[in-house]
Amino acid sequence: LMGEAIDATGIQFKLLNRSRGPAVWSPRAQADKHRYSNWVRDALKREKGISWIRGRVDSVLVKDSKINGVSLSTGACYYCKALVVTTGTFLNGIIHIGPEQHAAGRVGEPPARALAESLKALNFRWGRLKTGTPPRVHQSSIDFTQLSIERGDQDPVPFSFMTNSLEGNQIDCYLAHTNERVHSLVRQNLNKSPLFNGQIQGIGPRYCCLLYTSDAADE
């Protein structure tokens, strides 16, 4: 399903590492996130045997040491013999934006605090993972003449075997480079980063690391 979804909503397709052997070829696609979400929703709604109920799950119901269902914030209960919880970033989620932090599942959405406490009470092992999101810049604020164009593949390869061909125009990407002035500004403001001022405890990703973690390592 995910392969079909990206084939239908992708805005650029590119096969990475093409200059090397097939073993390391890596297909990459960028999607219109709103179209992607809507496409998946509509595809699932067409499936038989699936009922859709919108609401916030606050607790997991257990009876005789077996799963029995869930209760929603509205007080409604739905009973089942098996339950799959796809938590994403919502369980007691925290967002850090520079020195500021607040509870959230993701930007603009509240965290799932009650569900987190319910799972803790059932003695699930608990941990926390970190994700990083690059800052967004407004298109009108960018001087594209100073950037290098990176176009998608002329004959892109679909992600799904069920897709015969990819249709629609692709959108160009642009490559920018930093310089010593940028690196100097980053180093001067490392104390404002939650990774360095103690707000976040843990180790960041090894690959695709943030610019300022690279600068800190170079010092």
Stretches with model-predicted labels:
Residues S73-A82:
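Core beta-strand elements of the Rossmann-like FAD/NAD(P) dinucleotide-binding domain
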